Amino acid sequence: MKEEISVCWFRRDLRLDDNAALYEALRGPYPVLPLFIFDTKILKKLSNREDPRVTFIHHTLQEIHSELATQGSTIAVEYGTPEEVWIQILKNYNVKAVYTNHDYEPNAIERDDALAEYLASEQIEFKTFKDQVIFEKNEILKADGKPYTVFTPYFNQWRAKLNEFYIKSYPINNYFNNLLKIASLPLPTLAEIGFKESSQKFPSKRFGSKLTDYEDKRDFPAVDATTHIGMHLRFGTISIREAAQQALKQKANKWLSELAWRDFYMMILWHFPRIVHQSFKPAYDNIQWLNNESDFEAWCEGKTGYPLVDAGMRQLNQTGYMHNRVRMVVASFLTKHLLIDWRWGEAYFAEKLLDYEMASNIGGWQWSCGCGNDAAPYFRVFNPELQAKKFDPDQAYINHWLPEYKQQKHVQPIVEHAFARERVLKVFKDALNE
């Protein structure tokens, strides 16, 4: 008779400390086998065989694998569709319960609903927990029970509700003896899952020192004043509770509000999954985009003739990261100066950003375009040259990512600002019948 076990399925929570599902699994009645699935449905969509995010996940799994070995346990790392893998897991083990953390993206919800149904048919419990946000789903609502769609009142309630209970870490170390005692299972190589090692450098998990000057310096792209932990929050290598604890400890209120924006966009995506393909404000889907492919290519390659836009795109293409102020500028430029559908830009960011999160990325793009909930008004058209003067006055950022600018070899602007502004105002007004 096979030993009865629980399985803890890791997804966007790649850490052994302060992990809600792992904590609950280890406190349950059965020894726990950790599991990670390299989902072929997701991997097949990645065009770059050296995608740095896959390398990052693989490195992180190696660390988890080694740490579990010191506890006399292991992590099962499988490759395939979740459906295929779970059928095999149930053949190999006597699974009594499955624990995992919530995911708010529509495809993930569909996947988890299907798994819950399958496990129920096998008389196996499926238990899910909040882990990647402070407040989720219906935890912050208006008095009428409806979700907030404007950030400021949402944040006021979020901040008022925030207390030690919601950010307390889960003391997992106390329960490591409840891990399944088993010889180490082999970890598939990157080559075995169809990828190659990326040479990309990844951001540090240490961010506390960045919080002191964050509010004053965060808008200046040449100053390394942001934490760069977006990637760690996205893959769960840092706990959101730990991040909030640090913010409160250092009274970094502006940075704390950025964590709340992340919660807000996750909540919006959960309540309004249609925003994956549609504008939050439906009227904006009437916009007659130009969608000129050569203009889009110039934007992607950082060859628009606007130095701040081009520097941002070069930074993105070379590092998988772009400063947040510059993200707003390049998104506004694509949608308003070039009249290219925000979905094109969102998809390009999804392909390139190491810290890509669907909820925040869609939220940011719709904000910049004007078509999102609580978005910038459509008639607010960033002037990239004024943005550069204000936030990169010494041109340190531009010169770093755009060396030809210093040598005066930079390309001419592909569209004139005043013309583009008048054009977009007319196109948007026509679409909105204003």
Question: Predicted regions span which residues?
Answer:
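Hydrophobic alpha-helical segments, especially transmembrane helices
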Residues: R12, D113, D263, V326-M328, ...
